[in-house]
Amino acid sequence: MDLPVDEWKSYLLKKWASLPKSVQDTISTAETLSDIFLPSSSLLQPEDEMFLKELSSSYSVEKDNDAPLFYREEGNRKFQEKEYTDAAVLYSKGVSHSRPNTEDISLCYANRSAALFHLGQYEACLKDIVEAGMHGYPERLQPKMMVRKTECLVNLGRLQEARQTISDLESSLTAKPTLVLSSYQILQRNVQHLKIKIQEKETLPEPIPAALTNAFEDIALGEENTQISGASLSVSLCTHPLKGRHLVATKDILPGELLVKEDAFVSVLIPGEMPRPHHCLENKWDTRVTSGDLYCHRCLKHTLATVPCGSCSYAKYCSQECMQQAWDLYHSTECSLGGLLLTLGVFCHVALRMTLLARFEDVDRVVRMLCDEVGSTDTCLPESKNLVKAFDYTSQGESEEKSKIGEPPIPGCNVNGKYGSNYNAIFSLLPHTEKHSPEHRFICAISVSALCRQLKADSVQAQTLKSPKLKAVTPGLCADLTVWGAAMLRHMLQLQCNAQAITSICHTGSNESIITNSRQIRLATGIFPVVSLLNHSCRPNTSVSFTGTVATVRAAQRIAKGQEILHCYGPHESRMGVAERQQRLSSQYFFDCRCGACHAETLRAAAAPRWEAFCCKTCRALMQGNDVLSCSNESCTNSVSRDQLVSRLQDLQQQVCMAQKLLRTGKPEQAIQQLLRCREAAESFLSAEHTVLGEIEDGLAQAHATLGNWLKSAAHVQKSLQVVETRHGPSSVEIGHELFKLAQVLFNGLAVPEALSAIWKAERILLVHCGPESEEVRELREMRSCLLDSSFVPVGPLV
């Protein structure tokens, strides 16, 4: 996903193994980017490019004239099954493969409008109706579309427009009575029904505008930090010989305080599951729903009404504005490279986009500093002592003068000492060139070389054909492949340590269930220069959340003045043990973690955390040991082999998965019976706070909620809460999500005092971690408003 597809990696590893040792040594011992890039690039042969071209053709993003009909029929099948979301996505795939101003695209837009109507997305439905008309929607089908348009307008309260649409429809039917009698009669009944509906709406009082609290709350930082763009005045940028650049608190900070709000300098949406290779005969077209089908490829906004790129079938956007911005900034170059970029991976794609978004003359100037001084490690390896000289390319003379009269500027800062979210800061992020394996450097360098050659070929073709399509690839940019390639290679190496996973909270649950499970999904890979200043801790004092491409960093606890502000890079103490955390951080980020959590765990005796622990079948005390586990209760002599307990746990997990499948397929009663058997088995050898017991209780809560047994569901959520709290802590975002679920159950069960209490607890925690713009916080506030409404009269909880 981040790196090239396995076939290309394997191919290059074989090529690396076949190289003479002298060539391997040249690349392995290279100290500059140009010393890595130039020898590697010279090794890229025509047969290598042909192999990569064949691989890329398997992930083609060209429009297929036969695809719209297939996707429309698949969408129709889902529509008949009332799976309207899946239907909308399939119609969108049809739109993406359609040519403008064809019946194919107009029918796909029209059908998608029907799916959006059933999902209550009336504004999006109206836009699709307009698009269908613009692309030549057949006149014979227009009356049906006008009825749908009227229904949308009525539901939106736009009654004058609804009346005009009805009038236009009646005039059209009178002027061209082409419908068969039965269809005409059905249409007339629909028209009369809509007229009555409009009259009823007109007698209702004006709707009250949505409360301001339901709108997106401004989370501006207030007064601007003059040292760091996008940061609050509560933080300051410092340097340290061991820590490097890092952020510290300038005052005492309270939980929930906003510290950094930064838009990604670059982000690339992750395709999710890779598209099936087109040589797979069993499925020529992919019907799977991935993140690439649900989110705007520029701003990452969730949308079912995607706007397609006019030239490829892959890129999709939330609006014409986003599509045009993407085209102007980078997609005009990337569009024809779609299959190649999918093959080379997200990191290569991000590296290309980072360079495209920079001012090209700056890129040339920066990387020429590296390439012109092939023998100098001072400018090519920013880890070296002449750090400032390597970075301050914006005004080198002024910087040298400044360093004579005082402290040198912090790397990435401009001549005024400000660190911004710009290419200068991006370039200052460390690539750790010497720490990457020789094989990894070779794979990256060859991949970038192949991309550069294709860029040059596209540029020559564009000039020959005088095509504006690839105008972003300027002749100057492709004139020197060393400059272009060295910049992208640097960025590709930077990304292993500096890329940020942009995530979103995904709510899942069966169609019948009103309560939802929350899980974090990775949407995109982004680069955030300011967020990258945060050092890691396995027990961080901040929470990072995302709204589209904007990262928000909040204090997760009290942070004292002078204390370092820390972020978790992924390996968190509540998710994995110290040994696994240390291994992951060392292999990906090249450092040995010495945070408080790692230090405390190393000092403790090696014992499994309670959420992974086994218990004694006799006295329920925790078991301890390595290959053979003994009861921790001194008066109990019970012992058992670890392998035996692990085998039992694996069998139990399979049984839980079977129960979850029953729940997903609409069989809650059977799921309950299966889960109760699982719970009985689990309690005989697992600790009361074991994660699997939490999953069982969560499944029972879902099943009872599906059946409307709200109080029983709430009781199981309470037990699941105990497991989550043991693992993640009482103030964690995970507890916030679980309390949100409890609030939903109690709200639906009309248990007013209990629901209000759960809402208050959930909101208090989620505000700290996610802020007031969180969807869950908004829903909690809506539930509270409803419960406190004087007109709300509970009829007693449903059992």
UniProtKB/Swiss-Prot annotation:
BP-aspect Gene Ontology terms: heart development; methylation
Domain of life: Eukaryota
InterPro entries in the record: SET-MYND_domain_protein, SET_dom, SET_dom_sf, SMYD4_SET, TPR-like_helical_dom_sf, Znf_MYND
Location(s) in or outside the cell: Nucleus; Cytoplasm
Catalysed transformations (reactions): L-lysyl-[protein] + S-adenosyl-L-methionine = N(6)-methyl-L-lysyl-[protein] + S-adenosyl-L-homocysteine + H(+)
Domain SET, chain residue ranges per copy: 233-570
UniProt-reported outcome of changing residue 226 to K: In strain: Czech II
Zinc finger (MYND-type): 296-335
Residues engaged in binding Zn(2+) 1: 296, 299, 318, 322
CDD domains: SET_SMYD4 (cd10536)
Molecular function as annotated in GO: methyltransferase activity; zinc ion binding
EC number of this enzyme: 2.1.1.-
Effect of residue 208 to V: In strain: Czech II
Binding locations of Zn(2+) 2: 309, 312, 331, 335
Record GO cellular component, one term: cytoplasm
Residues annotated to bind S-adenosyl-L-methionine: 112-114, 535-536, 569, 591
Enzyme class: transferase
Keywords for this protein: Cytoplasm, Metal-binding, Methyltransferase, Nucleus, S-adenosyl-L-methionine, Transferase, Zinc, Zinc-finger
Complex and partners: Interacts (via MYND-type zinc finger) with HDAC1.
UniProt family annotation: Belongs to the class V-like SAM-binding methyltransferase superfamily.
Function: Protein-lysine N-methyltransferase. Monomethylates PRMT5, modulating its transcriptional activity. May also act as a histone methyltransferase. Plays a critical role in cardiac development. Acts as a key epigenetic regulator of gene expression during cardiac development via its dual activities as a methyltransferase and negative regulator of HDAC1.
Protein name: Protein-lysine N-methyltransferase SMYD4
Annotated organism of origin: Mus musculus (Mouse)
Gene behind this protein: Smyd4
